[in-house]
């Protein structure tokens, strides 16, 4: 895990608050979580690219999206190596692996080792942390 990785985009808290919606700010900057089955994209089957809502960096392709039944958009791999960073998360009485945008450090969600082939991983992502670009 890369807890010491510094994001490339650095903005003030005031700049983030001005740019992001309240939901996006809570998730991306305060490490919040949307309730399952309430955020955008959890049941979307459109083809396209999911980008970071904070910095527009490419994160996930629809070709890697699958229905995990958890209520959040789930993917088996990021769009490219290095698109996201992993961080130890020991909040809420459990240990998980948090996923952040490598470009701006925004909180995206968590990754779990219960996904489908070929990776066996499930990137469980808050829909409000992303914007969708159809192809």
From Swiss-Prot:
<dbReference type="GO" id="GO:0030091">
    <property type="term" value="P:protein repair"/>
</dbReference>
<keyword id="KW-0862">Zinc</keyword>
<keyword id="KW-0560">Oxidoreductase</keyword>
<feature type="binding site">
    <location>
        <position position="104"/>
    </location>
    <ligand>
        <name>Zn(2+)</name>
    </ligand>
</feature>
<dbReference type="GO" id="GO:0033743">
    <property type="term" value="F:peptide-methionine (R)-S-oxide reductase activity"/>
</dbReference>
<dbReference type="InterPro" id="IPR028427">
    <property type="entry name" value="Met_Sox_Rdtase_MsrB"/>
</dbReference>
<dbReference type="InterPro" id="IPR002579">
    <property type="entry name" value="Met_Sox_Rdtase_MsrB_dom"/>
</dbReference>
<feature type="domain" description="MsrB">
    <location>
        <begin position="13"/>
        <end position="135"/>
    </location>
</feature>
<comment type="similarity">
    <text>Belongs to the MsrB Met sulfoxide reductase family.</text>
</comment>
<keyword id="KW-0479">Metal-binding</keyword>
<feature type="active site" description="Nucleophile">
    <location>
        <position position="124"/>
    </location>
</feature>
<feature type="binding site">
    <location>
        <position position="52"/>
    </location>
    <ligand>
        <name>Zn(2+)</name>
    </ligand>
</feature>
<dbReference type="Pfam" id="PF01641">
    <property type="entry name" value="SelR"/>
</dbReference>
<feature type="binding site">
    <location>
        <position position="55"/>
    </location>
    <ligand>
        <name>Zn(2+)</name>
    </ligand>
</feature>
<protein>
    <recommendedName>
        <fullName>Peptide methionine sulfoxide reductase MsrB</fullName>
        <ecNumber>1.8.4.12</ecNumber>
    </recommendedName>
</protein>
<dbReference type="GO" id="GO:0008270">
    <property type="term" value="F:zinc ion binding"/>
</dbReference>
<dbReference type="GO" id="GO:0005737">
    <property type="term" value="C:cytoplasm"/>
</dbReference>
<dbReference type="GO" id="GO:0006979">
    <property type="term" value="P:response to oxidative stress"/>
</dbReference>
<feature type="binding site">
    <location>
        <position position="101"/>
    </location>
    <ligand>
        <name>Zn(2+)</name>
    </ligand>
</feature>
<dbReference type="InterPro" id="IPR011057">
    <property type="entry name" value="Mss4-like_sf"/>
</dbReference>
């Amino acid at each position: 895990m890369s807890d010491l990785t510094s994001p490339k985009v650095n903005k003030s808290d005031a700049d983030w608050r001005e740019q992001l919606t309240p939901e996006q700010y809570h998730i991306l900057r305060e490490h919040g979580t949307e309730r399952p089955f309430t955020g955008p994209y959890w049941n979307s089957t459109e083809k396209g690219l999911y980008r970071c809502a904070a910095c527009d960096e490419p994160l996930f392709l629809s070709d890697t999206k699958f229905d995990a039944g958890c209520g959040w958009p789930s993917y088996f791999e990021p769009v490219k190596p290095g698109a996201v960073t992993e961080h130890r998360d020991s909040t809420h009485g459990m240990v998980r692996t948090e996923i952040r945008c490598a470009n701006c450090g925004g909180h995206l969600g968590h990754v779990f080792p219960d996904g489908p082939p070929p990776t066996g991983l499930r990137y469980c992502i808050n829909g409000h942390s992303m914007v969708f670009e159809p192809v």
